[in-house]
Structure formats: structure tokens, C-alpha cells
């Protein structure tokens, strides 16, 4: 569902930070200044939200996942609820360094968490250990669950990351940019929109503001999931990993079709700037990006020669 301009106004999306804390790169999203506070242009916010929903829809229809990121305590519950409602993954405790750039190690921790949870169930392996050992494993399980419960179903790198506060989540934003993962983020007047594929200018501190925008993104994911074709289940795709150095190898006994599918080369992710230019429909931006890539190819050819 696309929120109206009136709903954005009532939710306080237009309230920015104090003028002395602003980032000059957010100038194009600022409407005015009132009592030492920047007022955000809601017309541009609404336009950016539409672009964000379009990008989210494209990612989900390709069969890729979306990761919600918000480590602010007062907003974590809201973001988690919206992520669970649309079947997306989420990080609401703290960003683990290397969550994306060192995904193989994180995946091992997720597998360990699943093993500990299975062993703690009735009739599980925990019953064969002493009470002290059970207590230690239970503590380890709780510690892992605190940081990894929202990404237990993540078997590969997400296709898109939705961030609540781009400035606070700068480590996650940096990792996503290194891997070419598109980012949709709520950017307050103190953020750097150049690091985001589709920045949504808005209040990233108010509960109603974040809830309204997160709900719009969640609705876009839910609608796209209903239209998307059936994808392999988590168990079927558990062995395939996006960040594998050797690529995806066919499983033992897999059919010819399955082997051909796994041998397909990985598609190269577009850069955030190219995604933003394509969504905005700016022909000049698209031509500039293509020209830049062509220049790099020519330089590479000259150096080889």
C-alpha cells in the first residue's frame, strides 16, 4: 500500500534534525528551515518511496531475499514485526562485522545455532549430557539466537537491504556497497544519500514515521511474493551459497536439469548508482554510466596491448 502525502505529514516524516547537524548532500531533499530544524520535502519523499517499492518488487520477483536492518532499540520491535509479516530476514540487535563480506563464517554460526536448537528439544542430544554441559550449551544457544535469529533462513547473500538509519548502520551499508547489493534506506537530514541506491528522505527516529515507511516496503514485498513463481525451499537451497569461491556444485544424484542450473555463471550485480539512475529514468545518467564502463574496458584493452 502506498501511503498518501497526508499520512506522511501526520506521521511526522517531514521533521529532520537540527540545522547544525545536517549533511549538505541532503540539500535536495530539504524543503525549508523552521525554528532551527530542517523540514523535509514530502513530495520528494513520496517519489523516492515509489522508486524503492519498484526496486524491492524487481528483487523479489527475481527470487532474491530482502534484509531489514535496524539496531535502534525503540524501533527494533516494529521493524522485526514488518519483516516477519512479509517473510523477510532482519537484523535488530547489532550488526555482526562481516555478516555480508564474510558470509561463509556467519553461515557456520547459523548452522551451529540450528544444531543447538534441535538438541535442546524434547528427546534431543542434550539429554545425554550432564546438567552443567546442558547449561553451557543452552547459554551458547541463547547468545547465538540473540544475534542470528533473524537470519536463520538466509542461505545466500540478500538481493537487497532495507536500512532504517543509514548513518547509524554505516558498517552494514559499507559491506553492502562492497558487494554491489542495492540499498533502500530512510535517510534523515544528517545522512549521506550518495551511499544509498534509493534514499528515502524522512524522520528515522519517530516510531510512526518508521512504521509507515517500513509497512509500505513490507507490503511491496508481500505483493511481489504472491506474484513470484515457486522457488526451492530452504532445505533444497541450503548447500548453494552466493559467496562461494568455487561456485555452486551439483549435489550427488542431482538430475541433469539441476546440474545445468547450478553451472550457470553468477550474474554480476549492478552498482547502486546504476540502479538509481535506471529507476529514475534518467537517460543521461544511464548513458554516463555506460560510457564510464566503456572507458574502463578501453583502458584495460590498451594496458593489455
Give, region by region, the residue ranges found by the protein language model:
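Intrinsic structural disorder
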Residues: 1, 5, 12, 263-266, ...
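Ribosome large-subunit tunnel/peptidyl-transferase-proximal elements
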Residues: 1-229
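Generic intrinsically disordered, low-complexity segments enriched for polar/acidic and small residues
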Residues: 26-28, 239, 265
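Internal, active-site/partner-interface "lid" segment
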Residues: 126-129, 133-138, 223-259
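Arginine-glycine-rich low-complexity intrinsically disordered regions
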Residues: 242-285
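Intrinsically disordered, low-complexity regulatory segments in nuclear proteins
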Residues: 274-305
Amino acid at each position: 500500500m502506498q501511503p498518501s502525502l497526508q499520512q506522511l505529514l501526520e506521521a511526522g516524516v517531514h521533521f529532520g534534525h537540527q540545522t547544525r547537524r545536517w549533511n549538505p548532500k541532503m540539500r535536495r531533499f530539504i524543503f525549508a528551515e523552521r525554528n532551527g530544524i530542517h523540514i523535509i520535502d514530502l513530495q520528494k519523499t513520496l517519489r523516492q518511496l515509489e522508486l524503492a517499492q519498484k526496486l524491492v518488487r524487481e528483487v523479489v520477483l527475481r527470487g532474491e531475499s530482502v534484509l531489514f536492518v535496524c539496531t535502534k532499540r525503540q524501533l527494533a520491535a516494529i521493524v522485526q514485526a514488518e519483516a516477519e509479516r512479509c517473510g523477510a530476514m532482519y537484523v535488530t540487535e547489532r550488526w555482526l562485522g562481516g555478516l555480508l563480506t564474510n558470509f561463509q563464517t556467519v553461515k557456520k554460526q547459523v548452522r551451529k545455532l540450528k544444531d543447538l536448537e534441535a538438541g535442546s528439544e524434547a528427546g534431543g542430544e542434550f539429554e545425554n549430557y550432564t546438567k552443567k554441559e546442558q547449561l553451557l550449551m543452552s547459554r551458547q544457544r541463547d547468545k547465538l539466537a540473540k544475534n542470528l535469529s533473524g537470519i536463520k533462513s538466509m542461505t545466500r547473500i540478500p538481493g537487497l537491504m532495507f536500512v532504517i538509519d543509514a548513518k547509524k548502520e554505516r558498517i552494514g551499508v559499507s559491506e553492502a556497497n562492497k558487494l554491489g547489493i542495492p540499498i533502500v534506506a530512510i535517510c534523515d537530514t544528517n545522512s549521506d544519500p550518495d551511499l544509498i541506491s534509493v534514499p528515502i528522505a524522512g524522520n528515522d527516529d519517530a516510531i510512526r514515521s518508521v512504521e509507515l515507511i517500513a509497512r509500505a516496503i513490507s507490503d511491496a514485498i508481500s505483493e511481489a511474493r504472491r506474484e513470484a513463481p515457486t522457488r526451492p525451499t530452504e532445505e533444497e537451497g541450503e548447500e548453494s551459497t552466493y559467496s562461494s569461491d568455487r561456485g555452486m556444485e551439483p549435489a550427488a544424484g542431482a538430475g541433469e536439469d539441476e546440474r545445468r542450473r547450478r553451472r550457470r555463471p553468477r550474474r554480476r550485480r549492478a552498482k547502486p548508482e546504476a540502479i538509481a539512475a535506471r529507476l529514475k529514468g534518467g537517460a543521461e545518467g544511464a548513458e554516463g554510466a555506460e560510457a564510464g564502463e566503456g572507458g574502463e574496458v578501453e583502458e584495460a584493452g590498451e594496458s593489455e596491448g
